[in-house]
Amino acid sequence: MGLLDSEPGSVLNVVSTALNDTVEFYRWTWSIADKRVENWPLMQSPWPTLSISTLYLLFVWLGPKWMKDREPFQMRLVLIIYNFGMVLLNLFIFRELFMGSYNAGYSYICQSVDYSNNVHEVRIAAALWWYFVSKGVEYLDTVFFILRKKNNQVSFLHVYHHCTMFTLWWIGIKWVAGGQAFFGAQLNSFIHVIMYSYYGLTAFGPWIQKYLWWKRYLTMLQLIQFHVTIGHTALSLYTDCPFPKWMHWALIAYAISFIFLFLNFYIRTYKEPKKPKAGKTAMNGISANGVSKSEKQLMIENGKKQKNGKAKGD
């Protein structure tokens, strides 16, 4: 007998039981959350984080439509300040995690979460909270792309990376603000110091961009980061580290998704043969010296005619 053939009372009982189990599970998960962070900003409830992420996705959808008939914003100074501000923020996070884990005697192989109010543990938890906040601030990367009409930069990889990092790290801070969680955040914040340094330098304009030949190595660094994260997490599973197993497996799956996406980006950007462009220094159909391509072609053709002493049709 199927569920649809059951008596109304029994169906209601099944639904009621399922709802009660869900509520009990929710209460249980809340009971094992990290008490140290429960009153920190954004940590009382998931709704502020989910609301910010929803607004972000709405802007990704509506922003390009709003900018369609508008001139792109000129944001050089804003970008310089923002990018070097992110360098300082990530440097602060890296330093706090490194010093906190060092003083707490953390192991890079296996480290359980200490939920005590030990000064070093609270320092690590606070640094991880700042790391979570930094992922929310990074939504501005996308906002600036859209306001500058660089919509080609707002790829699936870009949106997936930004949206999931901020949203999922709320879970990390709520339940495991310490222990093994420090390693990935420490590694990622270090890479972001390098990454935002590059972006900050590019914001100065073309005169410095010729010295920034190392852009492709940023993607390689990120790919190495994901492989190191998987290896570190797999080692923790192998040693039966007393850290939530579900989070270990979730982290491995998450890192694998990034490897596929970043590898695809790297191949398309640096390995596939590029289509020939109309002119290396051309900007919107006009070359660097202000002469359009069609005018240049006519000048070349006229020069050939004069060299031969007569026009082609004479």
UniProtKB/Swiss-Prot annotation:
Cellular component GO terms, alphabetical: endoplasmic reticulum; endoplasmic reticulum membrane
Molecular function as annotated in GO: fatty acid elongase activity; G protein-coupled photoreceptor activity
Highest taxon in the source lineage: Eukaryota
Record key words, sorted: Disease variant, Endoplasmic reticulum, Fatty acid biosynthesis, Fatty acid metabolism, Glycoprotein, Ichthyosis, Intellectual disability, Lipid biosynthesis, Lipid metabolism, Membrane, Neurodegeneration, Spinocerebellar ataxia, Stargardt disease, Transferase, Transmembrane, Transmembrane helix
Record membrane topology: Multi-pass membrane protein
Any Gene Ontology biological process: fatty acid biosynthetic process
PROSITE patterns hit by this protein: ELO
Tissue spec. comment: Expressed in the retina and at much lower level in the brain. Ubiquitous, highest expression in thymus, followed by testis, small intestine, ovary, and prostate. Little or no expression in heart, lung, liver, or leukocates.
Transmembrane segments: 42-62, 78-98, 127-147, 165-185, 188-208, 217-237, 247-267
Region annotated Disordered, chain positions: 275-314
Enzyme Commission numbers on file: 2.3.1.199
Reaction catalyzed: a very-long-chain acyl-CoA + malonyl-CoA + H(+) = a very-long-chain 3-oxoacyl-CoA + CO2 + CoA; tetracosanoyl-CoA + malonyl-CoA + H(+) = 3-oxohexacosanoyl-CoA + CO2 + CoA; hexacosanoyl-CoA + malonyl-CoA + H(+) = 3-oxooctacosanyol-CoA + CO2 + CoA; octacosanoyl-CoA + malonyl-CoA + H(+) = 3-oxo-triacontanoyl-CoA + CO2 + CoA
Post-translational modification remark: N-glycosylated.
Top-level EC class as recorded in UniProt: transferase
Motif extent (Di-lysine motif): 310-314
Pathway: Lipid metabolism; fatty acid biosynthesis
Comp. bias (Basic residues): 305-314
Positions with biased composition (Basic and acidic residues): 293-304
Localization, UniProt: Endoplasmic reticulum membrane
Entry-linked InterPro entries: ELO_CS (IPR030457), ELO_fam (IPR002076), ELOVL4 (IPR033678)
Protein task: Catalyzes the first and rate-limiting reaction of the four reactions that constitute the long-chain fatty acids elongation cycle. This endoplasmic reticulum-bound enzymatic process allows the addition of 2 carbons to the chain of long- and very long-chain fatty acids (VLCFAs) per cycle. Condensing enzyme that catalyzes the synthesis of very long chain saturated (VLC-SFA) and polyunsaturated (PUFA) fatty acids that are involved in multiple biological processes as precursors of membrane lipids and lipid mediators. May play a critical role in early brain and skin development.
Known partners and oligomeric status: Oligomer.
HAMAP family attached to this UniProt entry: VLCF_elongase_4
Record's comment describing the protein's domains: The C-terminal di-lysine motif confers endoplasmic reticulum localization.
Medical condition linked: Stargardt disease 3: A common hereditary macular degeneration. It is characterized by decreased central vision, atrophy of the macula and underlying retinal pigment epithelium, and frequent presence of prominent flecks in the posterior pole of the retina.
Protein name from the UniProt record: Very long chain fatty acid elongase 4
Organism: Homo sapiens
The organism's taxonomic lineage, starting at the top: Eukaryota, Metazoa, Chordata, Craniata, Vertebrata
